[in-house]
């Protein structure tokens, strides 16, 4: 139990501009529909220490007259992130009513792909090429569409062959303008291997550097299976493709809309879900992971133009909380939720280069006087290792039902370390703990046994050396 340890310090937050490299990002989506004020969020996002910000390109907001592109609105966003040391990556989307009459009725032209007429296809090609050219040197990663396997984002009905051809062509346009740009495809929200394989059969993999996927779940252990399956499938078509976790998250209260809306979320549970999912993503070996999202905002995926009530579908996924005005725009002070501080701690701990590693560590399943029960076995706990040039981290937690069950128990660990120093870090509040001598048995030859090592339903880190 954590109360047996001695607190000796606190994780110091790092600003994004002070972090050279990181695998952790935050969603900054939906500004194509102007749903929140980015000016009130930039500094708070940078203070969290994320290194990636996902944007949506907003074709309909940018090209209101055929062939005329007004990039001013998104220029400001991209420049603000670049100035703060954050890499913007852009999801190219959605439709445009000047090319597609069906999009005239759809708020934000969401889910109206330009694939049916030569004029639509040419309009999209010209827009993509203009966008990539305009942002060359500032934007390096481009994602093709968003959740095309969902009815809300491919409104005439999801079709994997259509998506594959669309992605293939868009990837070709991107590479023609900027051969160094990275192209991300898939962007899928389901676990439909058949859909993804059918899309790959069109040849889209020839133009992809990455496949992204969205994993909204209260069970973060599902991430490992998803990453393994999608990676192996992608490698069949192109062995160079890697994975990006493009959206994950949970809500901070009940009564919301969007993914996982029906569950009994609280701000505390949201913070737990962020911690467990983010570190699971890091364990899975994805290129980077992006949490959805920076801000409480309307979902705005199924709105009708002229009918405000149709898109007042509030989602409470943000690490920043907000109020809403009569038009559904996020207003107020944009306060920091507990999940924000947990994200900030994780960003600080995992700043810089690190790699996955195995740890010479075992759990001893013995009777515990503290719990009057047997200690947890390693097979009952999620575990993973990381190392850098200065130390190692062993991350672990008990994967209880995050919505119903909190855990504060103990186990016994035996491990080898080449370092003289080891501590425990709680990512939830950033506390750094020393292990009291009475809990340590020194076995010699670099081997230690820790009795009554705390285990929680949120990640604890056994840190050896100077990883942090």
What is the predicted role of each segment?
Residues 363-420, 459-461:
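Carbohydrate-binding surface patches
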Residues 414-433:
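Solvent-exposed beta-hairpin/edge-strand motifs
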Residues 258-370:
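Aromatic/acidic polysaccharide-binding cleft in carbohydrate-active enzymes
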Residues 2-130, 143:
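N-terminal substrate-binding region of glycoside hydrolase catalytic domains
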Residues 22-28, 53-55, 88-92, 140-144, ...:
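Hydrophobic faces of well-ordered beta-strands that scaffold small-molecule active sites
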Residues 436-468:
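C-terminal beta-strand-rich structural cap/linker in extracellular carbohydrate-active enzymes
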Residues 35, 103-233, 254-274, 407:
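Active-site cleft segment of glycoside hydrolase catalytic domains centered on the general acid/base Glu
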Residues 212-259, 277, 287, 291, ...:
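Glycoside hydrolase catalytic-domain groove-lining segments
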């Amino acid at each position: 139990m954590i109360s047996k340890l001695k607190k000796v310090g606190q994780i110091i937050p790092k600003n994004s501009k002070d972090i050279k490299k990181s695998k952790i990002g935050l969603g900054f989506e939906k500004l194509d529909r102007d749903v929140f004020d980015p000016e009130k969020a930039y500094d708070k996002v940078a203070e969290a220490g994320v290194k990636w910000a996902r944007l949506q390109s907003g074709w309909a907001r940018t090209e209101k007259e055929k062939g005329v592109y007004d990039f001013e609105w998104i220029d400001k966003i991209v420049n603000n992130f670049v100035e703060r040391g954050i890499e913007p990556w852009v999801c190219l989307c959605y439709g445009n009513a000047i090319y597609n009459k069906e999009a005239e009725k759809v708020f934000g032209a969401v889910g109206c792909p330009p694939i049916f007429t030569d004029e639509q296809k040419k309009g999209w090609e010209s827009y993509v090429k203009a966008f990539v050219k305009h942002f060359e040197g500032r934007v390096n990663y481009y994602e093709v569409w968003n959740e095309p396997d969902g009815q809300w984002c491919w409104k005439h009905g999801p079709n994997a062959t259509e998506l594959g051809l669309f992605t293939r062509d868009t990837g070709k346009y991107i590479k023609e303008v900027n051969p160094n740009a990275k192209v991300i495809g898939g962007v899928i929200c389901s676990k439909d291997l058949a859909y993804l394989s059918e899309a790959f059969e069109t040849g889209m993999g020839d133009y992809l550097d990455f496949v992204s996927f969205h994993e909204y779940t209260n069970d973060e252990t599902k991430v490992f299976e998803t990453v393994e399956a999608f990676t192996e499938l992608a490698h069949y078509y192109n062995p160079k493709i890697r994975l990006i976790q493009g959206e994950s998250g949970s809500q901070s209260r009940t009564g919301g809309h969007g993914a996982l809306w029906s569950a009994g979320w609280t701000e505390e549970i949201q913070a737990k879900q962020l911690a467990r999912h983010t570190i699971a993503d890091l364990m899975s070996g994805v290129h980077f992971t992006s949490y959805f999202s920076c801000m409480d905002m309307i979902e705005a995926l199924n709105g009708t133009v002229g009918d405000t009530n149709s898109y007042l579908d509030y989602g409470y996924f943000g690490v920043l909380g907000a109020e809403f005005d009569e038009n559904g725009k996020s207003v107020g002070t944009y306060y920091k939720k507990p999940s924000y501080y947990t994200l900030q701690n994780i960003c600080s701990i995992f700043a810089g280069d690190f790699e996955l590693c195995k740890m010479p560590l075992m759990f001893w399943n013995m009777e515990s006087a503290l719990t009057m029960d047997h200690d947890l076995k390693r097979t009952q706990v999620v575990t993973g290792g990381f190392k850098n040039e200065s130390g190692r981290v062993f991350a672990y937690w008990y994967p209880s039902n995050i919505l119903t069950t909190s855990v504060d128990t103990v186990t016994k660990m035996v491990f080898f370390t080449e370092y003289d120093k080891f501590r425990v870090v709680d990512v939830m509040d950033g506390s750094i703990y020393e292990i009291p001598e009475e809990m340590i048995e020194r076995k010699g030859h670099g081997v230690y046994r820790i009795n009554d090592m705390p285990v929680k339903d949120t990640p604890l880190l056994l840190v050896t050396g100077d990883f942090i």
